[in-house]
Amino acid sequence: MNTQLQQILRSHNDLVTTHEQTRAGFISFALEKNRRSTPYIEEAKSLKELASRANNPEELLNIKEIRRALITASGLSDKALKYFTEDDKVRAVAEMIDNFLKPAGNGFIDELVYRFLLIRGDSLGGTMRNIVGALAQQKLVRCFISTLSVMGIPFTWYDGKSWHIGDTRTPNIEEAKAISWANDKGHRVLAFNLTIKTVNKNVDICLFNANERTFDNNNIAKNCNRSAIMFGELKGGIDPAGADEHWKTGNSALERIRKSFSNVGRDDLQTSFVAAAIEDSTGREIFSQLTDNTLSFAANLTASKQLVSYCNWMILL
C-alpha cells in the first residue's frame, strides 16, 4: 500500500460506507429524481388542460395537440414507436380508450393523465438507472478540477469536440470528457468512458501520459500500450444491496485490464477502484488488494477526504 493511502486508510472499516453516508446518498438521488420529474409533471398538467376539450373519450382522438401524449399513455415507449405503423398507433390508442378510459366514466381525463404519468414514470426510472454513473463521474470530475485549482495547477478540459481553458467557475464543467494538465513527470490526460483497444472493453477512468494533441480526440484509446498510466473502475450506486455485485464486476474488469496490459509488457500499469456503496465484506477484499499492491488505490465516493486524496494521487502520478 502506498504511503498516501496509509495516511487515510487504517483498516478496511475506513472504506465502508456509513449509515449516514448511505442515507445522504439516497436523499441526493431522490432530489435529483424529483428535479428530473418536473418536466413530466408539467407535461401532465398541459395534457389535462388540452384533453378537457373532449366531452367523451372518443373525442380525444380529434385533439391533434395531444396525439403524442395519447400514444404515450397507451403504453408505447419512444423506443418502441419506430417499430409501429400509424395504424398500429391508432389501434393502441383506441384499445386504451375502450379498455380503460370509457370504464372510467366522467373521470376519463384523470385516467388518461394517470396513465400518461405511469408510462413517463417508468421512463424516468430507466433514465435514473442510467444516470447514476454519470452523476458519479460528475462528482469525481468536480473534485478533481477543484483539487487542481487548489494546487495551483493550470488545466484544460475537453467537451467531446474541443479543448477549453480550465476555470472552476465554468458552468457544467463537471461534464468534461477529459482533463489535461502537467506535473513534474510530464503531460497528463485524465479521460472517462473510453473503449481501450488493448482490453476491448469500456474503462471508466483512464489516465494517460499524453497532452491534448496526442490524446487526439479519444483516438489514444486505440493504441495506448505505452502511454497508459492508470485505469480505474467507478461505481456510483448507493444501494448497499448492490455493493457486492459492484465490486465483483469492477474487480473482474480490473483483473482483465491488468492481464491484458501484462501481455504487452506493462506490468507497471496501475489500477484503482472508487465506489459509493462499500460494505464490510467488500471493504475487506479491497483493503487486502491494497495491502498486497494488487490494487494501487481505492476510495469511497461518499468520503470527501478519500476522494480528494484519490484526485491528488492521480494529479501527481
Regions found by a protein language model. Give the residues of each.
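Nuclease-adjacent, charged terminal/linker segments that flank catalytic cores
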Residues: 1-143, 147
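Residue-identity detector for threonine
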Residues: 3, 17-18, 22, 38, ...
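Extended aliphatic helical segments
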Residues: 16, 90-93, 113, 132, ...
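Alpha-helical structural elements
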Residues: 21-24, 35, 158, 176, ...
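Generic local-structure boundary detector
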Residues: 37, 51-52, 61, 71-72, ...
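Charge-rich, low-complexity intrinsically disordered linkers/tails
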Residues: 70-72, 82-83, 116-203, 210, ...
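Catalytic core segments in nucleotide and nucleic-acid processing enzymes
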Residues: 164-317
